[in-house]
């Protein structure tokens, strides 16, 4: 996994191994067959158009084994946590990552995700499919944008910088859950399909969430 540092925010990008990716495709395809479980019409979530299917916690009728997803995400989160431990004075050795929630989103042109944050420690997107963009598309089309708070000395206001991620198939982005983020609409054909997830860091000897990573 590669890391980008924004003092103190850390963003990671990982290439998903092919053997794991094929299992994630299967999970995603099977989930989106359940159009009866589509949450995209719920205005309390960020999705504007398309289809969102909850994988964890899942509807009892979904019947999809997400063990490959859980194993990959928790291993990835541990690597993120190990890297975080090299940049902080906190002792993070007593923590372990636990997948708290996961869902898959499938959207077409003109559809997007509104600005939002997640209630967890770290979150991520695994890119399953990417659209073919129109030649006249904007440079932001279909991209995930993270809003990064950056302090400036003069006149000591807080400004916002951004980090943008294209929907590159077989890649996963990892970021702190408290970062506000959005996904831009686009023009073109095909779908932007992702598996999104949240992880909490808990005490290795219990399921208690110890603290929020800032």
Residue ranges, per PLM feature:
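Short beta-strand micro-motifs in enzyme catalytic cores
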Residues: 10, 191-195
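OB-fold ssDNA-binding interfaces and closely related basic DNA-contact patches used
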Residues: 78, 94, 107
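Flexible, surface-exposed loop regions and adjacent strand-edge segments
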Residues: 212-214
């Amino acid at each position: 996994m590669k890391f980008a540092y924004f003092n103190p925010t850390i963003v990671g990008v990982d290439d998903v191994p092919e053997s794991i990716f094929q299992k994630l495709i299967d999970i995603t395809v099977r989930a989106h067959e359940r159009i009866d479980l589509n949450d995209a019409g719920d205005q309390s979530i960020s999705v504007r158009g398309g289809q969102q299917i909850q994988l964890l916690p899942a509807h009892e009728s979904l019947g999809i084994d997400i063990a490959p997803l859980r194993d990959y995400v928790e291993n990835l989160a541990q690597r993120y946590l190990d890297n975080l431990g090299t940049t902080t004075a906190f002792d993070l050795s007593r923590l372990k990552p636990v997948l708290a929630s996961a869902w898959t989103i499938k959207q077409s042109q003109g559809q997007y995700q509104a600005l939002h944050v997640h209630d967890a420690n770290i979150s991520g997107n695994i890119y399953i499919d990417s659209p073919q963009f129109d030649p006249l598309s904007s440079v932001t089309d279909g991209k995930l944008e993270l809003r990064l708070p950056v302090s400036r000395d003069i006149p000591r206001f807080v400004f916002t910088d951004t980090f943008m991620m294209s929907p590159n198939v077989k890649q996963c982005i990892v970021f702190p859950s408290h970062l506000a983020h959005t996904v831009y609409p686009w023009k073109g054909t095909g779908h932007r399909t992702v598996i999104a997830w949240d992880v909490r860091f808990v005490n290795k000897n219990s399921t208690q969430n110890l603290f929020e990573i800032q």
